Amino acid sequence: MLWARGRQPDHRIRMSQQTTIRKLAELVNTPVDKLLVQLAEAGMKFSGPDQVVTSTEKMKLLGFLRRTHGKADTPAEAASEAAKKITLNRRKLQEVTVNAGRTKTTVNVEVRQKRTYVKSDNEGSGRAAPMTPDEERADILAKLAASRQRNLDEQQRLAESDRARDEAIQRKRDEEQAAKDRVEAERKAAEEAAAAASAPAPVAAAPAPSSAPAARAPSSPSSAPRPARPAGASPASRPATPARPDDRNNAAKHKTRGSHVMVAGVEDDDATKRFAGQLHLSAADRARRSNVRGKPTGRPGSSSSRRNDGGRGSNQSNSGPHGFERPTAPVVREVAIGETITVADLAQKLALKGGDVVKALFKMGVMATITQSIDHDTAALVTEELGHKAVRADNADFEDALLAHAEDAQGETTSRPPVVTIMGHVDHGKTSLLDYIRRTKIASGEAGGITQHIGAYHVETGRGVISFLDTPGHAAFTSMRARGAKITDIVVLVVAADDGVMPQTKEAVAHAKAAGVPLIVAVNKIDKAGADPLRVKNELLAENVVAEDFGGDTQFIEVSAKVGTGVDTLLDAISLQAEVLELKAVADGRASGTVIESSLDKGRGPVATVLVQQGALKRGDYLVCGIQYGRVRALFDETGHQPASAGPSIPVQVLGLSGVPEAGDDFVVVDDERLAKDVAQQRETKRRESRLVASATNRMEDILAQMGKGEGQQVLNLVIKADVQGSVEALKQSLVALSNDDIRINVIHSGVGGITESDANSAAASKATIIGFNVRADASARKIVESNGIDLRYFSIIYDVIDQVKQVASGLLGVEIREEIIGIAQVRDVFRSSKFGAVAGCMIIEGVVKRSKPIRVLRDSVVVFEGELESLRRFKENVDEVRNGTECGIGVKAYNDVKAGDQIECFERIEVARTL
């Protein structure tokens, strides 16, 4: 550009003399080549820098450059540029209500809007010849006039629209006010008619106590008696008699002194109301102020809610019927109570003070503060105790609607694979049987050769797909077996032919019967020597499990998990039972099911093993699982593959939840993450409230228990971390069950995953022992454990955990002092000694009597003295002990009342270690 090097584009060029191109370039400080290019772009061709540039050519070049930079070359062009821009300004007044403390304040706000419209210059680009300046100016003026006319029309249209809207609003308000006035007039007419019908004869006014009030009485129209209005008279037919300020003052004075008696009748309030409004306000402002002033601030029947329309400070009386009547009977309220409620909320619903409810709870034996939550039963009892009625609150919220919608899954029902749970006693071959069916080696990889969590698999056989759940057989995993029986279709009870029915076998039968699930008995280890299938059938008869060949309906299949004998027959029995059950489910739509197991993987986060029962679970679905929620990031089957979806009766692992869910929780797929989060938070709130109520109850029971037992009970604190949720649950139940009157096992924290720094700090603060079941501590946790001397123990078999905790608890119990009788001597005669006093001549009839051991003197089998054996002699010789059948002399220290026929019992105190 010509003016690019720091110069303004409007520098003037001297045009009084002819100038060459080179000189012009020096003058404007621009290279010659660039100036030649700009001259060529302006339509002027020069052959060299020494040619002369005329003033006309300079002006032409200047105009070209100004147009290039967006500036008008001439005043006409400037006017044309200005004509292309139109600016509209608009002002609008409105009112905004803001909160100022307890009151609301109205603020006037002015909104200013400014818009600029620029007309494009595309229309003139296609014309062949440019217009003359006059024609261009006339055209621009015409367009400007048309634009102004359009703007005026638009403004007029907007003004008319605003006016019509305001008129409609005002008309609606007038109609509402007229309706209110009409209803008020009818109500007052009815009240006046009722008052006139029930009023006694008019009472004459009492004589004035002084002459001054008597002189003013005739001039005051309000003090003169007024005739009663007919019953059918309307308030609108009365004459308008505005009340003067002195009338109101006189009325106030008479009311204060009590010197006049009110005359039967109704005060004429309409005349005062007619002049109560402020005439200088608009209808909208008057309505707004009347709403603010007339808003009731107290209870119904209070003075603030009965304020009339006479304005501030009005002293007009109202002799109509009173708005509040004192109840003649106690008010019985119907109180809706949920699962939990705080004492303060209950007191508010009962319209009582919180202290009254707390007193009632104390009388019932419940100690609670005003902020403490109580359960529904306690709240219902105290409500009935206070004379009110308690009803259960309707908890029909969006969660119930969601679950109901999930149960009514859309789509056609199709046949689904059966879910088979394998149950039985420990080491009876459950996992080995499943290994043979799946052609895998799971049992060899289990710690200790026993299953310690639920395994979920689906197997494709020649008879169709079958889903298997392998449950632990150890006594500690009762809840796991109950959970497996709850979600299953068929229970396969594995019983070892050489071992027979064991305790967990009986428990599995009880779980199957409680769940109403058909039972198939697999008599395993049939290939071993000493196998007796008939014994198994006879023992199960005691549990009401009758075989088909005994006339019952339970199938007994003899199998061998080692060599595979009878496995095909077992699969045929499962398929036959599934056909009889006619298992069906919805294959499409929202998925729902149950969590079988859950764990925390360091690399993948929370992992939940779920069994789909309805619908199809796909990657990307939003699901709610107990108090956890999330989006399904990945699905894995038992082989580690990632299926696209999982249908009914298929177990899969789900990744993407917000936390580790509880085993046994139900899951359901929802539409979006927000709904899932709301449902999970509501469940968490309910669970927290229930936990607070339970903890408060347990805390009170602990206080009472400590008061009764004193401080003799020892407490062993534990922190339990395991690999899966089911193991945590089993460990807690088994270890807490070890508590007795002397020691209490207290699990202060438990969870899934590795031992973290937080777990170590909790153990250090409570002096607890950390138990890691198939998990390890990280570096930071190990550092805290070493610095604080925390007892950290790792386990992989649940037997070892229980045994070790028993040993630790036994160490806390200390030792027990026991007394063991070692010998009994019969007193035959008593001798006197100057040194020892009375000496008993005795015969040892049982055991051995030793010197310096404690003794008891028994007379007629009653202890009369307890002391120490001071002297033991035989043939005048001191001996250390005398055995059975030998005579001896015994000197009892500090006791001289020994008689013939007494028995001397010798015993010793020994320390015995206490165990659980």
From Swiss-Prot:
**Cross-referenced SUPFAM superfamilies:** Initiation factor IF2/eIF5b, domain 3, P-loop containing nucleoside triphosphate hydrolases, Putative DNA-binding domain, Translation proteins
Composition bias, Low complexity: 192-243, 293-305
Segments of this protein annotated with the region G1: 424-431
Location of region: Disordered = 151-262, 280-328
Q: Where is this region: G5?
A: 560-562
For whether the record's keyword set contains Transcription, the answer is: no
Q: Where in the cell is it found?
A: Cytoplasm
Return the similarity comment. Answer: Belongs to the TRAFAC class translation factor GTPase superfamily. Classic translation factor GTPase family. IF-2 subfamily.
Name of protein: Translation initiation factor IF-2
User: Source species, please?
Assistant: Xanthomonas campestris pv. campestris (strain B100)
Q: Which gene encodes it?
A: infB
